[in-house]
Amino acid sequence: MVGGSSAQKLTTNDALAYLKAVKDKFQDKRDKYDEFLEVMKDFKAQRVDTTGVILRVKELFKGNRELILGFNTFLPKGFEITLRPEDDQPAAPKKPVEFEEAISFVNKIKTRFQGDDRVYKSFLDILNMYRKENKSITEVYHEVAILFRDHHDLLGEFTHFLPDTSATASTNDSVKVPVRDRGIKSLPTMRQIDLDKKDRIITSHPNRALKTENMDVDHERSLLKDSKEEVRRIDKKNDFMDDRDRKDYRGLDHDSHKEHFFNSKKKLIRKDDDSAEMSDQAREGDKFSGAIPSSSTYDEKGHSQELAFVDRVKAKLDTADNQEFLRCLNLYSKEIISQPELQSLVSDLIGVYPDLMDAFKVFLAQCDKNDGLLSGIVSKKSLWSEGKCPQPTKSLDKDTDREREKIERYRERDREKERLEKVAASQKWAKPISELDLSNCEQCTPSYRRLPKNYPIPIASQKMEIGSQVLNDHWVSVTSGSEDYSFKHMRKNQYEESLFKCEDDRFELDMLLESVISATNRVEELLAKINSNELKTDTPICIEDHLTALNLRCIERLYSDHGLDVLDLLKKNAYLALPVILTRLKQKQEEWARCRTEFNKVWADIYTKNYHRSLDHRSFYFKQQDSKNLSTKALLAEIKEISEKKRGEDDALLALAAGNRRTISSNMSFDYPDPDLHEDLYQLIKYSCGEMCSTEQLDKVMKVWTEFLEPIFGVPSRPQGAEDREDAVKSTNHDREDQEDAVSPQNGASIANSMRSNGPRKVNESNQVRQASELDKDVTSSKTSDALLSCDNTQNDKMPKNLTTPDERAETKQAVSIERAHNSNALPLDGLLPQRNGKISSLSVAGLSNSNPKPALTSGTEELKPNYVNGPRVEIGDNPVIPNGTVAEWFAGEAKVEREEGELSPTGDFEEDNYAVHGENDMEALSKSKENDATADDASAPRSSDGSGNTSHNGDVSGTDSGDGEDCYREDDIDHNKVESEGEAEEGMSDGHDDTEGDMPVLSISVKNLLHVKPLAKYVPPALYDKDNDDSRKNSQVFYGNDSFYVLFRLHQILYDRILSAKINSSSPDRKWKTSNPTNPADSYARIMDALYNLLDGTSDNSKFEDDCRAIIGTQSYVLFTLDKLIYKLIKHLQAVAADEMDNKLQQLYAYEKSRKPEKFLDAVYYENALVLLPDEDIYRIECEQSTPSKLSIQLLDYGHDKPDVTSISMDPTFAAYLHNVFLSYQPNAKENPRIYLKRNKRKNGGDDELCTTDEVKIINGLECKITCSSSKVSYVLDTEDVLHRAKRRKLLNQSGLPLAHDSVCSGSLIRQRRTQRYQKLLTGQ
């Protein structure tokens, strides 16, 4: 059929004739004819357009020029298929496609359709169908053409990967056999191979049947050797074919697939021997995972060393190992395995030959430098190329090789996948332009940058040539921010949102007004022109020439839904519509101007309310985090984290160099620059406690605050209690009669009534003097009145009675005493009394009580002048407590204090601070008169008439070791000391009862036994005492506490810090924006405190408090917004501390340790005592330097290597009975000594001689004893001793060797002067 012109009229007969010609042409290729019919059906059903039909027909009829030209007669004009003259000749084979090109094309498709994954997945599905031979190459191209219909560049590049079909139609008998080529199972690199279907003769030899069946495939492989390597590289990145496909690929099931793909039923005939030999060689080459080139491409003369190396390997290894070595080289040459894997495999074969391994590295390097060298060596040295054709491998060997090949492919696929992911990640072209980092790209203006060259430019389907010339595809504007996006660096708060909305409303209204004003002016100008006849009324007016689009839009907006109708009228008859529109515009202008005036007031109010709030961006997050940061868990985690960071090898070495002692290095430090703030904190806590706590809880909480917490910071103690003022008046009225009852013969056994009160009270100095003057009139009670005057300090203090009965604590006392009896390292921690000026007023070893120590204001007491060196000395305690017996009995026994071995005083010796005087015998020793002989044994004062004979009314009360021998009767300049109430004694005395009622408490046996327990002293070497730190020790307070006290101090510090910030910021000069009228900074701070008090009592809410703080301080006020929660949390913690038994013990231990003189205080002793109470808990060393400013340091102690072992002791019941019933038994004397009647006949200064006897006496108590629980045997501990050393006195001699007479005269005059003073006192009755 000759191609005619398009003007020729075609008929149905022409079409039938053409179909008959096609059918005759492909009579042996029925599938091609059927495919042509399918193309026509698709075109008729409009599934394919004209272009698609042309492409498919051209591909189908390739090599049949007459059919293509005949098909042109049925095509429209302009769509004819043009053939070049060279199309008749077989085209040269295409250049093999490189693996990198295929990967690049796939990545380009993925990037182009990153917003539409469906296209990319469909493309992969099409290729997968072709790989599994479910689609022909024509169908693949047709579907890909539809898929890329708007991307002609991709479709054109896709054709580059299509198979070369130039030789498919060499003869009419050729058929198309779809085979897997150029890695189509993963990439669009496709080709078709038509095999020559000449008759073949099948050999009759049964052993050659398999080779004959595979002959065609082997021949095909020999034809594809130029692209085989690229096929395998592309196959690496896809799923492996299943066993059936692999068998198809190797030709093991060739007949079944031949019947499936071919219509021809002709039998295969055997080719010539050369073809059979080639088939054998190709099949043998399968062992090397691919065909091996038949010719060598390297110069054998130039690479004799490499060949020699292969020969050396062959000589060393046996045949199987050598074959394996060559296989490894072949896999590496095909790039199936990497170089490290090759070295690993080869090392298993020749690793035992070090020389071969070294030579192999050189060999491998040389092969990498020369392409084709390694494949040529393998092809030359392989067995089959040498003519040694091995026998067909067994099925087991084939399965092994197949499995090995499968493993290698899986491994290679994973490596290739990782490489592709890295390439894709490095390119990052899958991101949209808005997410690209173009900071390093070329910049032409501040806003525009050039896209990278590798970034895919989307193709515009309708872009014409002029568009390509003028439109920009390579320069993009970098988006830095937009009002549509929220701020990423800072979130807008609700107050800012209100301001933004106001700004938007103002802007919209302003724009409306401006548009109306502009439209009004334009309309007025147009009407003026019409009225002045500048525009003729008989000609239509083009309204767009006089009014802008904005003016027309404004007019349309005026009439809302009828705006378009008004615009039509305006355009049709502007002369009539303009006056009406102008009137409407002026009405709207006035209405919107009036609306703006009204809204300005509303907006001004919104600005006023929200401006300061909008500036606060930190309060929102601060409120969220503050409750978490103030939790106990967070505070503990904070210091533990800091402690762990500081703990390292350097610290450990430092501790080792320091004798394995603790290193004092604070973990946290806080400054307290303003001491006046402590008063504000006190008032805040007291006020909040009144709102939150009951009266009883208020007293306990404020006692911890005023008597423990504030003194550590150097704040003087203050009166405390809920009923201070009322009780002060009551106590003044009752002081006189209470003291008279205390010294009367009927109530002489107790002075509890003298201090009896149901609540705290104050003692007035003038009232005390008046009482004393009245009491002095009674001769029998004169000494008692003197004692009350001298022992009652002239200070205003509140003394709430916090009494506990001995029976309530008998069990606790017994347990603690037992533990101390077995542990000489434990200091007597129980029975600690309140301190005055750093001295303990009274001490009892009976047990740890639940009462809290109460620090008081510093008294004006003066210590006695010491007249000894390192000897025992006696001092006047600030607050002496009267022991058992009457008042007169107490003061009569002050002259002499008996001391037993092992008992030391903290003020006289550098060992145990206090000891207790127990039992009736001890009371008798104390009651010896000063005026009588020192050894006289006067009887003690009689008991009360209705009291029991076993104990006094006050119960277990112990004296103090720190009282001076002369006590309150000394004539020296000693201020009178205040008498402490027995209700504060740590032994837990019962509340005072009236003696007339006879309700005197009776102590239990266990408590009586504990009266004999003496404190166990621990000897501290004087070398540990550091005299250089006296000043620093006096100005600092050290406290060892647990987690509870650490949290307490931290909460106190946080509250102090926030109140300080309020005070500083309120007085800051940079407050111009706050108020127009400047105010006094003190007034600003007072306003903040008033607002805080209103918040605490519920007068105002949090919102009003926050507004007040912002108005006064500004943006820095956010730290004050949670003050109420912080204060409530601190009060709750104070309640927990006041109620916790262990916390009370720690406070008592602190008071006990502070009873020592500052120069005798030892941190190590305090620390070991704290370890006794907290053996398994964290211990914190809290130190406050009372300097200017005060500084608080907190350290979490790490025991390290020196943690002492605090062992718990379980006592045998038998030994316990012996200890309490025998060793500690107490038998009171039935006979009581009468009181001394003539007190003034007793020598007052009898203690002077006794003090002189102990002058220059050194006593060291180091003797220890141990008790065996099983036998109750007491024995001394070896290498322990007591030492008493008295230095001899030397007389001072003059030059002649005689005693100095002048000294004797001076001494005599002093004695006479002293006697005269005593005589005068006797006469005056003082």
Swiss-Prot record:
Amino acid composition bias (Polar residues), ranges on this chain: 744-757, 781-805, 844-861, 942-961
Renumbered residue ranges of the record's region Disordered: 272-299, 715-812, 844-864, 927-1000
Domain called PAH: residue spans: 8-78, 95-165, 292-367
Pfam families, A to Z: PAH, Sin3_corepress, Sin3a_C
Superkingdom field: Eukaryota
Basic and acidic residues: compositionally biased ranges: 721-737, 967-981
Annotated function: Acts as a transcriptional repressor. Plays roles in regulating gene expression and genome stability.
The name this protein goes by in its record: Paired amphipathic helix protein Sin3-like 4
Species, as recorded: Arabidopsis thaliana
Lineage: Eukaryota, Viridiplantae, Streptophyta, Embryophyta, Tracheophyta
Gene (name only): SNL4
